[in-house]
A protein has these predicted regions:
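Beta1/beta-strand and adjacent pyrophosphate-binding region of the FAD-binding site
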Residues: 1-14
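Core beta-strand elements of the Rossmann-like FAD/NAD(P) dinucleotide-binding domain
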Residues: 2-4, 96-106
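Glycine-rich FAD pyrophosphate-binding loop
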Residues: 7-9, 23-43
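Flexible, glycine-rich phosphate/dinucleotide-binding loops
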Residues: 15, 38, 56
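Hydrophobic/aromatic beta-strand patches that form the interior of the parallel beta-sheet core
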Residues: 30-32, 78, 108
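N-terminal Rossmann-like dinucleotide/flavin-binding domain of flavoprotein oxidoreductases
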Residues: 42-101
Length: 108
């Protein structure tokens, strides 16, 4: 069974931001995208209140930029959905929609 240092569930802005910081700190983050890769912002036409985009930005573009930045710092992105998590003991055990299981020391 694969054993990860840091696993992040969800690929919205919070997931990618966590991956950027975890990657910069050397924690080798792996992001599992979930049901909607890029999160709900991929459904948003224009975002006008996000720092660094004075003219606004499309939701898809923002999420693409966040993904690139997370990958730049070592994040790996996987397209799977978590269906079960055992958080009763460490390392945590997560099961995914393809029947695979993963151990992780840190879960975000």
């Amino acid at each position: 069974m694969e054993h990860l240092k840091t696993l992040i569930l969800g690929s919205g802005p919070a997931g990618y931001t966590a991956a950027i910081y975890a990657g910069r700190a050397g924690f080798a983050p792996v992001i599992y995208e979930g049901l909607q890769p890029g999160g709900q912002l991929t459904q948003t036409t224009e975002i006008e209140n996000f720092p660094g985009y004075p003219e606004g930005v499309e939701g898809n573009q923002l999420m693409e930029d966040l993904r690139k930045q997370a990958e730049r710092f070592g994040a790996e992105v996987r397209n799977k959905v978590c269906v079960k998590a055992d958080l009763s003991k460490r390392p945590f055990t997560l099961k995914f929609d393809d029947e695979s299981e993963v151990l992780t020391d840190t879960l975000i």
